[in-house]
């Protein structure tokens, strides 16, 4: 999910070479998740494109599936949610060897997001793919790339634990 501003929370992950973007300067100002896209070794596409997406909720028309719609340059489409923690879960339909993710949280205002990204083959037993629960670095327009040894997962879940915007909405 490449988000210009991974409405992060939302959640965004990137594949090795593919990005999905979401976010808009007109988004709900209190709590905006990131966008996500994912890739696998040897796979140049966004593994999250067309995937089933569920979330703990959404704000207005900022539906979960907008976090992985592949419209990286459409600033008017993103996933937004209020409350902490909030989560976004992506079902790729079948287990895939995932080796990279890229998250694009909303970066204006120097926001610092705390979140974790987990993967699962069955949607019940989760393994950590990326842990930003102690993050102290502000989000930027480059997003946050994560590379790791290939992990076989069907589901990817990003859980936003907080931000420094003065509220958890």
Question: Model segments located where?
Answer:
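Bacterial N-terminal signal peptides
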Residues: 9-18
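Short beta-strand elements bearing conserved aromatic residues within extracellular beta-rich modules
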Residues: 115-117
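Surface-exposed loop/edge segments in extracytoplasmic proteins
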Residues: 124-131
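A short beta-strand element within beta-rich, extracytoplasmic domains
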Residues: 96-109, 158
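Bacterial N-terminal signal peptides that target proteins for export
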Residues: 1-8
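Short beta-strand-plus-loop segments that form exposed binding edges in beta-rich domains
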Residues: 159-167
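Disordered, acidic Ser/Thr/Pro-rich linker "stalks" and the adjacent N-terminal cap
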Residues: 23-94, 106-111, 131-140, 148-150, ...
């Amino acid at each position: 999910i490449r988000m210009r501003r991974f409405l992060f929370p939302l959640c965004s992950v990137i594949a090795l070479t593919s990005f999905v973007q979401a976010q808009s300067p007109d988004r709900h100002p209190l709590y905006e998740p990131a966008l996500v896209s994912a890739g696998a070794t040897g796979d140049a596409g966004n593994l999250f494109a067309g995937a089933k997406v569920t979330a703990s909720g959404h704000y207005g028309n900022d539906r979960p599936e907008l976090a992985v719609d592949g419209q990286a340059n459409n600033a008017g489409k993103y996933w937004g949610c209020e409350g902490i923690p909030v989560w976004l879960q992506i079902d790729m339909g079948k287990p895939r060897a995932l080796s990279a993710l890229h998250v694009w949280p909303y970066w204006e205002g120097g926001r610092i997001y705390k979140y974790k990204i987990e993967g699962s083959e069955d949607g019940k037993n989760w393994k950590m793919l990326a842990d930003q629960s102690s993050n102290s670095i502000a989000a930027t327009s480059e997003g946050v790339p994560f590379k790791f040894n290939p992990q076989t997962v069907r589901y990817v879940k990003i859980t936003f634990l907080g931000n420094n915007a003065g509220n958890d909405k």
